[in-house]
């Protein structure tokens, strides 16, 4: 990295807005389409299962391209790569919006996923490298807010657009944001390019990465639909992923110019930070996916209202993050993360105790609001720990690798959560159904009560079956909340293996 004077004043503010908007745009796009899949599939004359490839295609392409960011940044420069990625993302978004067939949409979602990969790691790296060292914690805090708020806004915005406008606007909204990001970046970072190196292309590493991570991501996305290892396709994808990733690790550790710099894991703080942020994000993101589905399927919420019930989690971080960033240099990051994990556990236990049939909007919204304290003390401190002790020229590679592990953990968390939810519901459904028989006086009393309300026996059976399904879904969700709370308490000990001092992005030690 060329040693340049950090930005100041208005230039610093404009750059912060530009990089935060780019992060917001990319994270938003990974969740905004989820609730609109039925609308998109119906409009393009496809089945719902075919429509899910709109999500899968983006996730696979994005998972492959994120780890490449460090190598690409060394090759072409961080500023240039960031600008071209933003421009390409805006163009691909427009192309997604005008797609007239599902195949066309999936093709442009792949392009969108590929060019989106560098946006988050580079926004993080450029932010840290152009901020005054004393203010880097504030920069990370502001950046973290966008990562927190965007996944919450996605389902709300996606639901509102698909309910009221053409689904194409889900993608069109990226175009003006992309243009604004490019203009602001040119104004502030032109002439501040990072040093480049003419490195040969690690073709073997690239091929293994594409095959291994691509197979793994498709397996995670398609597993639940295909009933996991009952499907030959899932078994083949798993074998291919395991073999390719094992070869990738061996190859990258022995190659002179690796496309993924695994030597970063020699840093104790990088390894501990990646582990903590990935495992915690796995639980956090799994709940982000589970909660709206539970509210829609059991409690009859619309997509928009389910999103609004999840939204309060973003309120506290918006208020607290700048304050935490301001005083971060006086705080032990491990204490903040410990507080965060305790609050996560408290909120998951809270849900497990209070989620029941007939609960109101507040029963869902209040735990989300309080969980905001956990989220505010999560991303920024763990990112600071992860990047501490690394020289500026390794920040892009470190940021891309840590964001890759976090993104992959989110996919794994989603798959595990939704699969457990479905499987446990089936088990509870079978157990609850056993009690509905002619020999159970409570069951017969319920039938009599329903028939007294004018239902036929068939209608009463259907109503009871639906209630059993709802009970099973609630019980299985509560079991997941119990398990998540327990794992957060176990994670408390892991963060204390990190070694201070924790300077944000290059400042401070960090054990090697």
Curated annotation (Swiss-Prot):
Name this polypeptide is given: Multidrug export protein EmrB
Entries under InterPro entries matching the protein: EmrB-like, MFS, MFS_dom, MFS_trans_sf
TM stretches of this protein: 13-38, 52-72, 82-100, 110-128, 137-159, 165-189, 203-223, 234-249, 272-295, 306-329, 336-355, 364-387, 408-428, 482-504
Keywords carried by this UniProt record: Antibiotic resistance, Cell inner membrane, Cell membrane, Membrane, Transmembrane, Transmembrane helix, Transport
Major subcellular location class: membrane
NCBIfam families for this protein: efflux_EmrB, EmrB
The organism's taxonomic lineage, starting at the top: Bacteria, Pseudomonadati, Pseudomonadota, Gammaproteobacteria, Enterobacterales
GO cellular component: efflux pump complex; periplasmic side of plasma membrane; plasma membrane
Alphabetized CDD domains for the sequence: MFS_LmrB_MDR_like
Record GO biological process: bile acid and bile salt transport; response to antibiotic; response to steroid hormone; response to toxic substance; transmembrane transport; xenobiotic detoxification by transmembrane export across the cell outer membrane; xenobiotic detoxification by transmembrane export across the plasma membrane
